[in-house]
Every structure is written in structure tokens, then in C-alpha cells.
Amino acid sequence: MLDKNKQIWFIGIKGTGMASLALVLHDLGYNVAGSDIEKYTFTQVPLEKAGIEVKDFDPANIKSNDEQVIVKGNAFKQDNPEVAACLDKNVEWQSYPDTVEEIVQMHTSIGVSGTHGKTSTTSLLAHVLGEVAPTSYLIGDGRGKGVADSRFFVYEADEYRRHFLAYHPDYQIMTNIDFDHPDYFKDQDDYTSAFQTAADQTKKALFVWGDDKRLQSLKTDIPKYTYGFKDTDDFQAVNIEKTTTGSKFNVLAHGKDLGRFEIHLFGDHSILNTTAVIAVAYTEKVPMEDIKEGLLTFKGAKRRFAEKDFGDVSVIDDYAHHPTEMRATIQAARQKFPDKELVVVFQPHTFSRTKKYQKDFEEILRDVDKAYVTPIYASAREASGDISSEDLVNNIPGSEVIDLDNIADLTKHKNAVVVFMGAGDIPKYEDAYEKLL
């Protein structure tokens, strides 16, 4: 249980979720510190900026439950020296999800779950609500902020290993249920059942994408509102105008026109995410004029269609690693850069996902102007497999395998948009390429 009279000690404080949570608690006035590996990570920058102490793993860091509340990262087991110290000293710990749930219960809370679009939607919702009321947020890309006396707490709810079932929010946005994490979930039914339980644990209302049949099949005792492009949706985006600077559209709430909204984001998925955000705000009686202003100042989420320009070459960094996400990112790139050559550098993420979606990946990459595939990114829980990047390239005409030693091949593309896609360490490929521009 969180306690402002004790130190909150994070075992694994540099993890993206853990770093975000540490920042939230620090902002809310808790005494936060923690430990992790020595290797530099991007998440330690905001921790250092906030003055949060980060030490190496050491059994001496573990005191007693009278002095500390221990928050243990999900990845750390008994072979970690601090976890071992907790066991030796009979010091109890709590998990990341259980700690987040304590914050969920302190505020009007909105969770964002779904296979795709969680980070983008959470970021947008936190930004828009934060423009009109004190809002704390926790985002899966390493960002978190606590605001004293917050009205809202907006957080990303990750379904992996059913972590999001620790939460009981007031509202929940569910973007889609598209089978993922085949290393953990047995099949689609097993995956969908986790979302059914999450829906059961939501208190006031559920907001779901109207085109997703699995979301439609969820049973709930609370209102379940749909959002999308169809006349049957409770919150419908209409009169859509797409340009190279973004999109404009009206939103109807149960047939009532809430006005015209503008976003500097691209692709149908961005319009859908925005409509979900508008639906939540409308339900909480947030003035629509305030929402319109907030949308205009939103710059986008980290590693979600993040753009840099180098003369006639635009470089996009995107977290897409599932077929649905890849299609959305490619659609967004075509909307913003209709006259440029579309070059995709794709890093497959985990062997099990690559095997499961091999045909989808190949189909998607056959549809771009030029495709490059890096070696498969192996996760800590899955170091090898019976598929390789060469297997994909062999089925994609004109594509090539690319690695750091031949990254210079990308420089032959002029008047191009080069999209780096992946959830692993693909930024190292992007960095190497940008140094050559």
C-alpha cells in the first residue's frame, strides 16, 4: 500500500511502465527511488531530470516494510539480488499493476486498452483532458505525470499476461481485439476472454470501436458506446476531409452534432482514436470547444509516426509491429506524403509473432515502393525460432535484408519517405541512417 511516510523503492525502475509510474508518484509527493541495470536506457532521462535516484541492483538497497514500499517489475525473479534480499528478509513487495490500481481508485479514471492504438489514444486523451482539468497520466512509452488534486487519471492498460485485470476504472476505451502475444495467450478465445473480464471490471461506461465484432460480443451491465464511421455508431465521425496537414471531421453523439474537429494527425486510425477521446470527454461533460483547442495543440505520441526531415527525405519512426498497425502507418504515410517514394524498413518483433503473421507481413510489404527487412528482434523470453528475415524477403519481390553494415543502401532513395517500423531496437538502424544524411 502506498504511503507518503515511506520510501517507494522500484526494483527495475528503468522499465517503460515502471519509469512512468515512478514519475507519477514522484509528482504526487511520494519519496521515490529505485534500481536497475547499468546499461543506459532512454527512460532514465526523465527520471534523472526529476531528481529520482537510480542505483545498481544491490541487496543492501532493500530495507524493511517499515521503511519501504517495494514495487517489483514483472520481469524480475528470484535470481535478481534485490528480489532474493526481499525473500531473505521477509520483505513483501507489490506489483506494478497493483500499484497503478491504487492510483486508479484515487481519481475519475479512464483506462485505454486494445491490441493497437493504446499509446496514441492514451497520449491524446491525457493531453486533451489536461488542457481543461488537472489530469495525471501513465503512458506505456515511458511518460508519466502526477498532478496534485487531479480530476482525471488516464492510463494505458496493457493486456499482456492479463496485467490490466488488476484495474477497476470508471471508464475504459477498447480500441480493438486483434489476437496478439501468441507466446502467452493460447488462442483468440483466450485473448478475448481477458477483455471480457476487463469490461466486467469497468464501473461507469465502455467505449468500443463499432467495427470490431469481438468488442461487440462483450457482455456488460454498464453502457457500452460504439464509436466509428457507421450510422449505427453512438459516436460517429462524418464529413471527413483528409489533407497533407491532417484531418477535419464532425462528430455526432447519438445523432447530435458536436461540431467540427481538426487534428494534425494522419490515417483513419487517428480519426477513430480522436472520436473515442471526444466520446469520453462528452460523457464527462467537458465543453467541446475546449476539446477542439486541445486537439489542435497535440503533437503526437512518442514513436508513433514521429517525423524528421532531411532535405527531400522524410524519416518516420513508428512502433508498428503487428499487421494492423503497419497498415495504419502506411496509410498515414501515403496521406501525408502522396508524391514521395514510400520506403519501409521493418524489424520483425519476436519469432512467434513473425511466424504467425508471416503472410500478412509479406502482403503488406509487397504493397510499398521498396521494402527492407532487418534481422528478427528476439525478446528475452524467446531467443530463437525457426523463421528468419530471409524467409520474408524471399516472398517480397524487390525487397532486401538490411543490417547496420549495409544501412548506406538507404541513401540511394531521393524524394522519399523512409518509415522505420518495429517494437525492438530499430531506432539504432534509424540513427545509423540519419548520420549518413
UniProtKB/Swiss-Prot annotation:
Transmembrane segments: none annotated. GO terms for molecular function: ATP binding; UDP-N-acetylmuramate-L-alanine ligase activity. Pathway: Cell wall biogenesis; peptidoglycan biosynthesis. Gene3D superfamilies: Mur ligase, C-terminal domain, Mur-like, catalytic domain, NAD(P)-binding Rossmann-like Domain. InterPro entries: Mur-like_cat_sf, Mur_ligase_C, Mur_ligase_C_dom_sf, Mur_ligase_cen, Mur_ligase_N, MurCDEF_pg_biosynth, UDP-N-AcMur_Ala_ligase_MurC. It is found in: Cytoplasm. It catalyses: UDP-N-acetyl-alpha-D-muramate + L-alanine + ATP = UDP-N-acetyl-alpha-D-muramoyl-L-alanine + ADP + phosphate + H(+). The keyword Nucleotide-binding applies. GO terms for cellular component: cytoplasm. SUPFAM superfamilies: MurCD N-terminal domain, MurD-like peptide ligases, catalytic domain, MurD-like peptide ligases, peptide-binding domain. ATP binds at G114, T115, H116, G117, K118, T119, S120. Keywords: ATP-binding, Cell cycle, Cell division, Cell shape, Cell wall biogenesis/degradation, Cytoplasm, Ligase, Nucleotide-binding, Peptidoglycan synthesis. Its EC number is 6.3.2.8. One of its GO terms (biological process) is peptidoglycan biosynthetic process. It holds the Pfam family Mur_ligase. It comes from the Bacteria. Belongs to the MurCDEF family. Cell wall formation. This is UDP-N-acetylmuramate--L-alanine ligase. It comes from Lactobacillus gasseri (strain ATCC 33323 / DSM 20243 / BCRC 14619 / CIP 102991 / JCM 1131 / KCTC 3163 / NCIMB 11718 / NCTC 13722 / AM63).
